[in-house]
Amino acid sequence: MKEQKWVHEGLITESLPNGMFRVRLDNEDLILGYISGRIRRSFIRILPGDRVKIEVSRYDSTRGRIIYRLRNKDSND
């Protein structure tokens, strides 16, 4: 049976080594996020200040996998 995961949105607050990031969720929780393989393969750059979707396990709510970088409203791309 596949593990159930929660999907949250958050803001990247700090960049850490090896594709890890400190993410502040919309509910004000601060968790550790790592880049999913699909984002890593696509060479998508994630910087502090970016909004992301993050998938969090029910069993360990202190870590999550970054699955999507949301587009900023003020950028031209």
Swiss-Prot record:
Where does this chain mainly localize?
plastid
S1-like domain boundaries: 1-71
Superkingdom: Eukaryota
Looking up SMART domains in the UniProt record yields: S1
One GO CC annotation, please?
cytosol
**Keyword Protein biosynthesis in annotation:** yes
Indicate where this protein resides in the cell.
Answer: Plastid, Chloroplast
Entry keyword annotation includes Zinc: no
Provide this UniProt record's keywords sorted from A to Z: Chloroplast, Initiation factor, Plastid, Protein biosynthesis, RNA-binding, rRNA-binding
One annotated GO molecular function is: ribosome binding
Describe the task this protein carries out.
One of the essential components for the initiation of protein synthesis. Stabilizes the binding of IF-2 and IF-3 on the 30S subunit to which N-formylmethionyl-tRNA(fMet) subsequently binds. Helps modulate mRNA selection, yielding the 30S pre-initiation complex (PIC). Upon addition of the 50S ribosomal subunit IF-1, IF-2 and IF-3 are released leaving the mature 70S translation initiation complex.
Membership in a protein family: Belongs to the IF-1 family.
How is this protein organized at the quaternary level? Component of the 30S ribosomal translation pre-initiation complex which assembles on the 30S ribosome in the order IF-2 and IF-3, IF-1 and N-formylmethionyl-tRNA(fMet); mRNA recruitment can occur at any time during PIC assembly.
The UniProt entry, under PANTHER family, shows: TRANSLATION INITIATION FACTOR IF-1, CHLOROPLASTIC
Q: What name does the UniProt record give this protein?
A: Translation initiation factor IF-1, chloroplastic
- Give the organism the record lists: Cercidiphyllum japonicum
